[in-house]
């Protein structure tokens, strides 16, 4: 009798994806973040589902319903903080996953890469809409500021913003539709993840050396299932430490004040994982220019396969590119810091310089260094 694992129409798909999948023998811990992102997505969908059972998407009761979840629902505080901090863990894993892809040249699988960038956009949209739902001060003003950016689009901008708002300001209609979109998007993300994996399994995984590893493959199970379980345990440990010891560490105190359209908070800023993009947006004095720079700060990832000039795939054996990569990482940390600072000297100029450097490294410096390293290969 043949093994059901290899013959059953459904089980054989799982088998080819997670059990008998040929995997490179030398992939490091940087390859763990894909599975960690999968776990983050599952945690977010489950905690979100239980929160949705008790949440009401109405401007009069939204803030109170979140308070009710934390005070009266069994382990509601745990579910709420796991969901809020789960988003932070999600973005930490996302940034590390993208950084791994850039460092080791995984973007040369351009279908997988481009689906990944679309996934990044979808997760960012979901997180933004989720931040609006508790209907605190930062929820309301964040929604107002970010949706207002669309008014910079020539001719249709104002109409578009009012259409998204469902009125002339962020109000009940906006909250209701944001809740609906926030609920449906994670399932769309799950479908995109399956497409992401489909394209990845067409080519097989990359590895740290960037070389073809067809001659040296090992089965995914048990080697990488065990490795992934270790990563998952560490992720859950980090998440639960954050949730149980310092649940509000990454949040904004202003969001514990109910939304008030008549009172603007002194510093409107998004959650920490959007601060780098927010800093790029603010560094340009022109509204439309800022919006374009904001969109390009993420869309630029799609250009990496075109901008790859090196004869080597990975940065493993390219010390000059490595150096530039880590300068880019430091620049992103700088932008994140600037995004959380008030708009005044010296933060304005630092933000502008960091934004210019961000685009310069990606569009000019890295490709030029790659061409120089190609020359060094001949010496």
Curated annotation (Swiss-Prot):
It is found in: Mitochondrion inner membrane. GO terms for biological process: mitochondrial electron transport, ubiquinol to cytochrome c. Keywords: Electron transport, Heme, Iron, Membrane, Metal-binding, Mitochondrion, Mitochondrion inner membrane, Respiratory chain, Transmembrane, Transmembrane helix, Transport, Ubiquinone. Its main location: mitochondrion. GO terms for cellular component: mitochondrial inner membrane; respiratory chain complex III. Gene3D superfamilies: Cytochrome Bc1 Complex, Chain C. Component of the ubiquinol-cytochrome c reductase complex (complex III or cytochrome b-c1 complex) that is part of the mitochondrial respiratory chain. The b-c1 complex mediates electron transfer from ubiquinol to cytochrome c. Contributes to the generation of a proton gradient across the mitochondrial membrane that is then used for ATP synthesis. Heme 1 (or BL or b562) is low-potential and absorbs at about 562 nm, and heme 2 (or BH or b566) is high-potential and absorbs at about 566 nm. This is Cytochrome b. CDD domains: cytochrome_b_C (cd00290), Cytochrome_b_N (cd00284). Heme b b562 binds at residues 83, 182. Belongs to the cytochrome b family. A ubiquinone binds at residue 201. Its cofactor is heme b. GO terms for molecular function: metal ion binding; ubiquinol-cytochrome-c reductase activity. It comes from Tamias obscurus. It is a multi-pass membrane protein. The gene is MT-CYB.
């Amino acid at each position: 009798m043949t093994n059901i694992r290899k013959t059953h129409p459904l089980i054989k798909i799982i088998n080819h994806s997670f059990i008998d999948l040929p995997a490179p023998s030398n992939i490091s811990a940087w390859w763990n973040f894909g599975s960690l992102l999968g776990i983050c997505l599952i945690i977010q969908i489950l905690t979100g589902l239980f929160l949705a059972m008790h949440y009401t998407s109405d401007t009069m009761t939204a803030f109170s319903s979140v308070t009710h979840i934390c005070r009266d629902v069994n382990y509601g505080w745990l579910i709420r903080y796991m969901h809020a901090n789960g988003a932070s863990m999600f973005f930490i894993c996302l940034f590390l996953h993208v950084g791994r892809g850039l460092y080791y040249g995984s973007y040369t699988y351009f279908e997988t890469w481009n689906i990944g960038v679309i996934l990044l956009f979808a997760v960012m949209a979901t997180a933004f809409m989720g931040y609006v739902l508790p209907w605190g001060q930062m929820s309301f003003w964040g929604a107002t500021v970010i949706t207002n950016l669309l008014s910079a689009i020539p001719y249709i901008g104002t109409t578009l913003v009012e259409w998204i708002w469902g009125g002339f300001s962020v109000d009940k209609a906006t909250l209701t539709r944001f809740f609906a979109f926030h609920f449906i998007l994670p399932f769309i993300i799950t479908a995109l993840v399956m497409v992401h994996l489909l394209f990845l399994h067409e080519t097989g995984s990359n590895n740290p050396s960037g070389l073809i590893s067809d001659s040296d493959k090992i089965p995914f199970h048990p080697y990488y299932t065990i490795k992934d379980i270790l990563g998952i345990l560490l992720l859950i440990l980090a998440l639960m430490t954050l949730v149980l010891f310092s649940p509000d560490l990454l949040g904004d105190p202003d969001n514990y004040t109910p939304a008030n359209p008549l009172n603007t908070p002194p510093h409107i800023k998004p959650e920490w994982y959007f601060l780098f993009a927010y800093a790029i947006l603010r560094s340009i004095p022109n509204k439309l220019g800022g919006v374009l720079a904001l969109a390009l700060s993420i869309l630029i990832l799609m250009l990496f396969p075109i901008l790859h000039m090196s004869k080597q795939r990975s940065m493993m054996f390219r010390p000059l590119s490595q150096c530039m990569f880590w300068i880019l990482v430091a620049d992103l940390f700088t932008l994140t810091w600037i995004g959380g600072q008030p708009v005044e000297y010296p933060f304005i100029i630092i933000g502008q310089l960091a934004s210019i450097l961000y685009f310069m490294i990606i569009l000019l410096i890295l490709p030029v260094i790659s061409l120089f390293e190609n020359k060094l290969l001949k010496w």
